[in-house]
């Protein structure tokens, strides 16, 4: 019973760290819980993806898929406080404006948004909206999307998995990056979560991080082609971090999450158009 209670606490600690969703008061907080709670990051993504899907489903009947997705994206930004988007913006400023490791880390730490950050986050959000919009446009769908001759339940399930995968799988790969690289700073906001991450935590994160992706591939095998976009992007992000700062920071993890999520959104264009 104590173990179950601890795991519940770890989930809420992770959710409180990554989002603005309030947790029950009885959860409490201990700093060492942050490290153990990181395995629940994909689970939080699973929840966020489900909530985003619900908002999208609600508004698409009123405004169509493009506006509905934009609203759902705004809803998610409110829930998370643009936590990962802020990291992506700082990452763009650091990598774009710094030539030395110390300069890059200093720029990333600066809370002000620079030209690279503003341009990067604008393009990122635009790619998300246009990617999903183009996917729906290919089939000229105004109601339930992804009509492949299957039942309405499969349509709903496919879209739900699409949204959940974008949020959970991207957070799983963000955790994986923590295992592949060391923490780049002596101190930082993400350091309590980053220390001593182990493979059992990675395996646990697979439950909610990888399962939705595999389920979507099972329903629509062509979605496996999305890895042609995801893997090179992940490797490129890894190479940038290893080359320029010899590790990762919290901003880097946010950038990885956002890049992979965007890859998943735009993958719908060349995956479902092939079916």
Swiss-Prot record:
Keywords: Cell inner membrane, Cell membrane, Cobalamin biosynthesis, Magnesium, Membrane, Transferase, Transmembrane, Transmembrane helix. It holds the Pfam family CobS. GO terms for molecular function: adenosylcobinamide-GDP ribazoletransferase activity; cobalamin 5'-phosphate synthase activity. It is an enzyme of class 2 (transferase). One of its GO terms (biological process) is cobalamin biosynthetic process. The keyword Protein transport does not apply. Its EC number is 2.7.8.26. The chain crosses the membrane at residues 53-73, 113-133, 144-164, 204-224, 225-245, 253-273. Its main location: membrane. It is found in: Cell inner membrane. InterPro entries: CobS (IPR003805). GO terms for cellular component: plasma membrane. Pathway: Cofactor biosynthesis; adenosylcobalamin biosynthesis; adenosylcobalamin from cob(II)yrinate a,c-diamide: step 7/7. It is a multi-pass membrane protein. It catalyses: alpha-ribazole + adenosylcob(III)inamide-GDP = adenosylcob(III)alamin + GMP + H(+); alpha-ribazole 5'-phosphate + adenosylcob(III)inamide-GDP = adenosylcob(III)alamin 5'-phosphate + GMP + H(+). Its cofactor is Mg(2+). PANTHER family: ADENOSYLCOBINAMIDE-GDP RIBAZOLETRANSFERASE. Joins adenosylcobinamide-GDP and alpha-ribazole to generate adenosylcobalamin (Ado-cobalamin). Also synthesizes adenosylcobalamin 5'-phosphate from adenosylcobinamide-GDP and alpha-ribazole 5'-phosphate. Belongs to the CobS family. This is Adenosylcobinamide-GDP ribazoletransferase. It comes from Leptospira biflexa serovar Patoc (strain Patoc 1 / ATCC 23582 / Paris). The lineage of its organism: Bacteria, Pseudomonadati, Spirochaetota, Spirochaetia, Leptospirales.
